[in-house]
Regions:
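Canonical Rossmann dinucleotide-binding motif of NAD(H)/NADP(H)-dependent dehydrogenases/reductases
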Residues: 2-30
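Catalytic loop of short-chain dehydrogenase/reductase
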Residues: 89-90, 96-109, 117, 128, ...
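C-terminal helical subdomain
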Residues: 175-178, 182-185, 194-232
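The beta1-alpha1 cofactor-binding region of Rossmann-like NAD(H)/NADP(H)-dependent oxidoreductases
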Residues: 36-37, 57-68, 102
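A glycine-rich helix->loop->beta "capping" turn
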Residues: 51-52, 72-85, 91-93
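Conserved glycine-rich Rossmann-like NAD(P)H-binding loop of the short-chain dehydrogenase/reductase
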Residues: 25-41
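Hydrophobic positions on the long internal alpha-helix
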Residues: 84, 119-123, 165-166, 211
Length: 232
């Protein structure tokens, strides 16, 4: 059976690399983006290379957008087997928590935490019913309590929340062959990471792709960097 993989924020950077690698592994992929033309361009490039892709329009902060995507994808493809929650923002790097702009913190929570939660809610029940699912959250060591420092409060707190959500969903889907994990890609040369970052997008995507294609009985409820477990 060909698996269906949906990747959020797949029009550039890590998301584009992840969706491309999954397509090359033989999955039918759904690259999503807020802009319909951007999502369609990714899908067209993949299909032109002989891969299978269906574009999806998605704003993770909108209930209506997520609901419309859910209806469209399930109506056309029947199910989603793999979900990679990649869409995210990082707009307060280096800013202090003391005196933080709380509206900016809320922006990070709305996209990074609630956005990925909203999309997961749309598809996790189907995964449980089908007795197969892989949910991957793109997180960060900056959200690990074990590594927590100062600065970047919206980004850090939102990713700490993502890590907590991973643990909850993994516990709630235990025994259903739904594996829920977080991936830390490291500091990657993307629009967010900047040109001085130490990793390529290929390196940054590797752990997420590995988690998205885990064999049955693989780990769940974990946090991984370079395919090795790290502390929350």
């Amino acid at each position: 059976m060909q698996r269906v993989a949906l990747v959020t924020g797949a029009n550039r950077g890590l998301g584009l690399e992840i969706v491309t690698q999954l397509a090359r592994l033989g999955l039918l992929v759904v690259p999503t983006a807020r802009d319909a033309d951007s999502a369609a361009a990714v899908a067209h490039a993949l299909t032109a290379s002989g891969l299978q892709a269906v574009p999806g329009v998605l704003d993770v902060t909108s209930d209506a957008s997520v609901g419309a995507l859910q209806t469209a994808v399930l109506g056309q493809l029947g199910r989603v087997d793999v979900l990679v929650n990649n869409a995210g923002i990082g707009h307060d790097f280096g800013r202090p928590a003391a005196g933080a702009d709380l509206a900016l913190v809320e922006d990070h929570l709305r996209t990074n935490l609630l956005g990925s939660w909203r999309v997961s809610n749309a598809f996790v029940e189907g995964m449980v019913a089908n007795r197969y699912g892989r949910i991957v959250f793109l997180s960060s060591g900056m959200g690990a309590l074990s590594e927590m420092g100062g600065g970047s409060p919206g980004y850090r707190v939102s990713k700490a929340g993502v890590n907590a959500l991973v643990r909850m969903l993994a516990a709630e889907t235990a025994g259903a062959n739904v594996l829920v994990n977080a991936a830390c890609p490291g500091w990657v040369r993307t629009d967010m990471g900047g040109p001085n970052a130490t990793r390529t997008v290929t390196e940054g995507a590797d752990t997420a792709v590995w988690l998205a294609t885990l064999e049955d009985g693989g780990p769940t409820g974990g946090f991984f960097r370079d395919r090795a477990a790290i502390a929350f």
